[in-house]
From Swiss-Prot:
UniProt protein name: Putative peptide permease protein BRA0408/BS1330_II0405
Organism (species): Brucella suis biovar 1 (strain 1330)
Keywords associated with the record: Cell inner membrane, Cell membrane, Membrane, Peptide transport, Protein transport, Transmembrane, Transmembrane helix, Transport
Principal subcellular localisation of the protein: membrane
Localization (cell): Cell inner membrane
UniProt membrane topology term: Multi-pass membrane protein
Biological process (GO), any one: protein transport
Function, in words: Probably part of an ABC transporter complex that could be involved in peptide import. Probably responsible for the translocation of the substrate across the membrane.
């Protein structure tokens, strides 16, 4: 097990390194001068002053040297300073934003798992029934709907028209922190984030349950007079969950992408909103730092998913 974890960790580090190189190259290919993000447009600067500032920031060095310098600092935990918020470090900005993003993703995935697994089981057990057809149609709609469109539609219906949920933010301004207020703001973004993932989980769960229900040991349990409820819970559910666990781990990356759109629509103060603002203002250190942290989180979750797969099914050996 330890050898497997180290092997996967080394592969993950290689993928993370490749990701940072790709983002660094793409940032260099974007039009414009990075120094523009550091200059106050209301203050006139001579070319000599701009060259001095560029040298101070290390932007006059060759690109490979710039990347290696950034990587060396990142390994030590120093992700640099924001070009737009001069007194704030990138690490500090990420630390203040990663909590809300993790909360949003955890809530969204929890809702998706509950809805997807439950409806998948019902559809499989009640195959070709009205419920089965209804859940299948809803799942198809959920998979086909883009995250940004679902977010805008949910915002319009539940916030603008029905007034059931706040239109944005994480807490009500000028009020003390309270759990009920946080949950009111969290409910709609988390529900919107869960829709596509719940649809995928439902389809996988239904297919896996149908396959497992046709196994010989399930038919034997039924022949012995075991109640259908216990046939599903004790003899079918655990084995049917194996491909779903893999799917849940693989959807973490998709959840990150969905969270970026949803945070921008609902003004949720997380990593997605931070990354979008950094791209808009060409804040390169924040873009690189946020990309590094997001990539590391996705890789770690994928490793944990593989380990969970082995725990659920002891027959599987990780080597």
């Amino acid at each position: 097990m330890l050898r497997y974890c180290l092997h996967r960790l080394l592969i993950g580090l290689g993928m993370l390194l490749a990701l940072t190189i790709l983002i660094f190259v793409l940032l260099q290919l974007t039009p414009g001068d990075p120094i523009d993000a550091y200059i106050n447009p209301n203050v006139a600067m001579t070319q000599a002053e701009m060259d001095a500032l560029r040298a101070q920031l290390g932007l006059d060095r060759p690109l490979p040297v710039q990347y290696l310098a950034w990587l060396g600092q990142a390994v030590q935990g120093n992700l640099g300073h924001s070009l737009q918020r001069f007194n704030e470090t990138v690490s500090g900005l990420i630390a203040s934003r990663i909590g809300p993003t993790l909360l949003l993703m955890a809530a969204g995935l929890a809702i998706a798992i509950v809805i997807g697994v439950t409806t998948g089981i019902i559809s499989a057990v009640r195959r070709n029934s009205f419920l089965d057809y209804s859940f299948s149609v809803l799942a198809l709609l959920g998979i086909s709907s883009p995250a940004f469109l679902t977010a805008l539609l949910g915002l319009y219906v539940f916030s603008v028209r029905l007034k059931w949920a706040p239109s944005g933010g994480m807490l009500t301004p000028a009020t003390d922190f309270s759990i009920p207020d946080l949950l009111r703001h969290l409910a709609l973004p988390a529900l919107v984030l869960s829709i596509g993932h719940a649809a995928l989980i439902m389809r996988y769960m239904r297919s896996s349950m149908l396959e497992t229900l046709n196994q010989d040991y399930v038919r034997t349990a039924r022949a012995k007079g075991v109640r259908e409820f216990w046939v599903v819970v004790k003899h079918t559910l655990r084995n049917a969950m194996l491909p779903v666990v893999t799917l849940i781990g693989s959807t973490i990356g998709l959840a990150v992408g969905g969270a970026i759109f949803i945070e921008s629509v609902f003004n949720w103060p997380g990593m997605g909103l931070l990354l979008i603002n950094a791209v808009e203002t060409r804040d390169y250190p924040v873009i690189m730092g946020a990309t590094l942290v997001i990539g590391a989180c996705v890789i770690i979750v994928n490793i944990l998913t593989d380990l969970a797969y082995a725990v659920i099914d002891p027959r599987i050996k990780v080597t």
